[in-house]
C-alpha cells in the first residue's frame, strides 16, 4: 500500500468527497496542507486576508450548496481569527470542517511561540473538536470530523500540529460517509393530538422559520385547509413568502405587516421549523384559556425553549404535516384570515411603502429606496448576503424571494462584517450567479481587507454599501433604551475611492434621481463592483408593534438630546421617520 503524508491524505479525501476549495491564510504550521492542495488536481486554495473571512465564506458555501465546506488557519492567532465565522456557521447549521493547525507536538504545553489550546477554544462553536496525535490517528479523526459536520449540520474542528501533518501514513482511506440523511418521522401520538387541537380551534395561525425548507407545499396545504394566515421569521422568508396567498409578513424587530397581530389573535398558533428567539413577539399569556401553542421541529432540543407549549411535536415539518392533514375534520371560516390579509395589505401599502414613494428629491438617499430599487433590478436568481444591523431590516422588508433567489446573513450569531465574506463564498460556489453583498459601512469597515480577496480572485461580486456614516442599529437600540446615541457616528468615508485604489470598479451615488440608472449600470458591469450609496443616517426601523416601554425610551432619549443642544438633530430624525411610523 502506497504511503503518503497525512496532509496529502486529508486533501485527497476532501477532494474525493466533493470539496472544491479550502479558504484560509497560509502559515508555517499549515504549510504541509497548503502544499498538498498545490499538488492535487480538483481542489484549490482560496487565499483570504483574514481567517475570519475564510470561515464566513466556507459557511456561506455550505449553506448554499448543503455540502461540506472547508476553511483553515495556522497555529495560534491564525486559527483564533476563525472563531466568529465558525460560530456563525455552527449556529446556522452549516456543515463546515475547520482545520486549525497547531505548534509542533513536542512543544505543546511549554508556552511556545504562538501557543494556544484550539481543542479547548473551539468547543462551544463545534459539534466535534479534537487534536490529531499522529498520522495514523488522524485518519480516524478526519472521518469522524467530516461525518459529524454532515450528520449534525454544523462545525467540526480538526486540530493538526504541523509535524503530524507531515507524518507518513498508509493510504488511501476508503471509509464510506453517509451524506444523504433521512428525515425525522413524527410519532403517531403527537400527530393525533395535533389534529385534535387544530379541529378544536376556531382560528389557526402558522409561524414558520428556516425549518420549512422542503415543506412549502405542505405548509400551504395546511393553510388552505384551516384558513390560516402564515407569518415568518427572516430565516423562513425565502422559503414561504413568494406566491403565498396566506402571507401576513414577518414578526420581530425586523418585522412588517400583520404577522404580530395575527399571532396574538389566533386561538391556535403553530410554530413550524423555527427557533425564533424573541419571545416578546411570540404569543403571550393574556388570560384567554382558548389560546394554544404548538411547535413542530426536527431538532427536539428546540421544542419549548422560547415559549410554553401545549404540544411539542418532534418531526420533520413536511412529514408531520403530511401525517396530520388526512386526520383533520373541522371546517374553518374565512373571516379571521380575510381580516389579517386586509391588515397586511394596509401595512404594506402604508408605512412599509412610505419610504419608496416620492423620494427622488430627498437627500441623503433613503436606504429603503435603495433596497427597493435593488430588489427590482437584481437577477431572478441573485444571491443576497446582508450585514447584521440595518441592512438586515432593509433586506427583510424589501428583498422579494421567488423560489430561486437566496437571502441570508448572520441570523443567529448576529455578528457584524458577515456580508462581504459570505458573498465571497457564494461567488466561489456559484460564479455564474449574481451575488450582492448588502454591506453596512460599519460592517464593511471591519473586514475591508476582503476587497483585496474579491480583486485577487476576480469574483463577480457586487458590494452595495449603505453608507450612512453611522452604526444605525446600535443608534436605534440606544434610543429605545432611553439613551442619546453616542459613539455611533463617524466621519464620512468615500468607499468608492477605496475600492478603486484596490483595483475594483466603483461608483458613488449621492443623487436619488440617478440611483436607478447608476445602480442598474453597476449591476450589469462584469466582474467585481463596489456601489457606494450615501444614505440617510436618521432613517430608523420601526418594529411592527411599538411598546409603551419603547415609546418611553424614545421620549427620554429625545429629551436628553434636546437638553444637550441637539434640537436640530431630533428634528432631522423626526422628518426622516414620520412617514414610517405604524398607523
Cite the ranges covered by each PLM segment.
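Active-site diphosphate/adenylate-binding microenvironment
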Residues: 10, 15, 28, 33-38, ...
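Thiamine diphosphate
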Residues: 31-105, 107-114, 253, 258-277, 304-306, 393-471, ...
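Glycine-rich, anion-gripping cofactor-binding loops and their flanking helix/strand elements
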Residues: 63, 210-294, 402-433, 445-449, ...
Amino acid at each position: 500500500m502506497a504511503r503518503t503524508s497525512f496532509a496529502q491524505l486529508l486533501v485527497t479525501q476532501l477532494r474525493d468527497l466533493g470539496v472544491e476549495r479550502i479558504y484560509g491564510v497560509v502559515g508555517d504550521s499549515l504549510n504541509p496542507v497548503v502544499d498538498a492542495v498545490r499538488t492535487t488536481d480538483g481542489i484549490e486554495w482560496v487565499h483570504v486576508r483574514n481567517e475570519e473571512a475564510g470561515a464566513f465564506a466556507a459557511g456561506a458555501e455550505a449553506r448554499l450548496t448543503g455540502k461540506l465546506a472547508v476553511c483553515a488557519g495556522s497555529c495560534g492567532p491564525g486559527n483564533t481569527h476563525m472563531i466568529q465565522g465558525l460560530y456563525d456557521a455552527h449556529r446556522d447549521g452549516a456543515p463546515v470542517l475547520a482545520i486549525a493547525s497547531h505548534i509542533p507536538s513536542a512543544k505543546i504545553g511549554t508556552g511556545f511561540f504562538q501557543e494556544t489550546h484550539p481543542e479547548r477554544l473551539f468547543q462551544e462553536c463545534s459539534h466535534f473538536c479534537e487534536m490529531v496525535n499522529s498520522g495514523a490517528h488522524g485518519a480516524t479523526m478526519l472521518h469522524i470530523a467530516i461525518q459529524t459536520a454532515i450528520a449534525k449540520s454544523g462545525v467540526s474542528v480538526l486540530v493538526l500540529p504541523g509535524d503530524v501533518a507531515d507524518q507518513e501514513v498508509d493510504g488511501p482511506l476508503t471509509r464510506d460517509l453517509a451524506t444523504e440523511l433521512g428525515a425525522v418521522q413524527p410519532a403517531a401520538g403527537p400527530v393525533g393530538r395535533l389534529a385534535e387541537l387544530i379541529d378544536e380551534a376556531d382560528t389557526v395561525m402558522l409561524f414558520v422559520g428556516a425549518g420549512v425548507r422542503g415543506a412549502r407545499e405542505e405548509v400551504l396545504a395546511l393553510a388552505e385547509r384551516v384558513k390560516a394566515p402564515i407569518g415568518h421569521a427572516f430565516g423562513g422568508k425565502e422559503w414561504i413568502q413568494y406566491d403565498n396567498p396566506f402571507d401576513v409578513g414577518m414578526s420581530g424587530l425586523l418585522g412588517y405587516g400583520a404577522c404580530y397581530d395575527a399571532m396574538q389573535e389566533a386561538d391556535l398558533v403553530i410554530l413550524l421549523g423555527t427557533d425564533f428567539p424573541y419571545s416578546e413577539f411570540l404569543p403571550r399569556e393574556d388570560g384567554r384559556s382558548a389560546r394554544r401553542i404548538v411547535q413542530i421541529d426536527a431538532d427536539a432540543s428546540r421544542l419549548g425553549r422560547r415559549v410554553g407549549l401545549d404540544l411539542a411535536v418532534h418531526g420533520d415539518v413536511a412529514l408531520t404535516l403530511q401525517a396530520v392533514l388526512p386526520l383533520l375534520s373541522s371546517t374553518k371560516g374565512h373571516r379571521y384570515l380575510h381580516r389579517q390579509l386586509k391588515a397586511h395589505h394596509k401595512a404594506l401599502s402604508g408605512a412599509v411603502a412610505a419610504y419608496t414613494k416620492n423620494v427622488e428629491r430627498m437627500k441623503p438617499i433613503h436606504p429603503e429606496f435603495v433596497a427597493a430599487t435593488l430588489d427590482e433590478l437584481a437577477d431572478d436568481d441573485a444571491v443576497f448576503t446582508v450585514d447584521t444591523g440595518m441592512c438586515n431590516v432593509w433586506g427583510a422588508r424589501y428583498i422579494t424571494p421567488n423560489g430561486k433567489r437566496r437571502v441570508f446573513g448572520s441570523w443567529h450569531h448576529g455578528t457584524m462584517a458577515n456580508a462581504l465574506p459570505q458573498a465571497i463564498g457564494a461567488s466561489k460556489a456559484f460564479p455564474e450567479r449574481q451575488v450582492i453583498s448588502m454591506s453596512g459601512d460599519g460592517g464593511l469597515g471591519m473586514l475591508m481587507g476582503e476587497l483585496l480577496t474579491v480583486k485577487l480572485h476576480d469574483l463577480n461580486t457586487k458590494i452595495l454599501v449603505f453608507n450612512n456614516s453611522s452604526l444605525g442599529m446600535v443608534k436605534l437600540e440606544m434610543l429605545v433604551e432611553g439613551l442619546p446615541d453616542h459613539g455611533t457616528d463617524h466621519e464620512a468615508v468615500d468607499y468608492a475611492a477605496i475600492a478603486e485604489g484596490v483595483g475594483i470598479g466603483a461608483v458613488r451615488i449621492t443623487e436619488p434621481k440617478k440611483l436607478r440608472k447608476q445602480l442598474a449600470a453597476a449591476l450589469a458591469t462584469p466582474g467585481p463592483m463596489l456601489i457606494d450609496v450615501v444614505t440617510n443616517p436618521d432613517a430608523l426601523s420601526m418594529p411592527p408593534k411599538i411598546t409603551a416601554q419603547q415609546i418611553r425610551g424614545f421620549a427620554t432619549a429625545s429629551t436628553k438630546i434636546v437638553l444637550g443642544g441637539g434640537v436640530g438633530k431630533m428634528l432631522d430624525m423626526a422628518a426622516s421617520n414620520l412617514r414610517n411610523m405604524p398607523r
